[in-house]
Amino acid sequence: MNKDDFNSVPSFETELLALLPRLRRFAQSLSRSAADADDLCQAALEKALNARAQWVPGTRLDSWMYRIMRNTWIDTARARTRAAETFVAEEAGTSVTGDDASTVEAGVVRREIDTAMNALPDEQREAVALVLIEGLAYKDAAEVLDIPMGTLTSRLVRGRQALMTMLGEAA
């Protein structure tokens, strides 16, 4: 690799910054609360920065970060269980601006989708969030979740069917 090739490769920090919106969405889908999602993002980013040497340049940083975030979420959930705390779903309010009826309707639809996503079992919600929301390939999502591709596919099918039922659409 010559000097020009090295300079054209995005830095770890640059790639990480570009991933922040996607990481935040994934954290929200895992934690079901905006405040917990922020805490989860911060903890996962801290772990990633501390483990930066373990990431191999040229590999998918998004898959690596999703795995770190998921493992951090699992650790947090276990710690809360041990402390006899329970997760209380916080209303994930969305702000609606303007008087436009379509904007108001979009806000209502968004809340319905958020409510339906939060009602899914964790395994289905993770699969749906990674594949349908974040756009990961099935193979990459299966690697992040550390499950066989067939298991991912069945969780997606069940998750989609449950969402369609909850949202009143024909399966």
Language-model features, listed with the residues they occupy:
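Arg/Lys-rich amphipathic alpha helix in sigma70-family domain 2
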Residues: 56, 67-88, 105-106, 158
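A short, charge-rich alpha-helical start-of-domain segment used by transcription regulators
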Residues: 2-25, 35-38
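Acidic, proline/glycine-rich intrinsically disordered inter-domain spacer in sigma factors
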Residues: 10, 14, 91-118
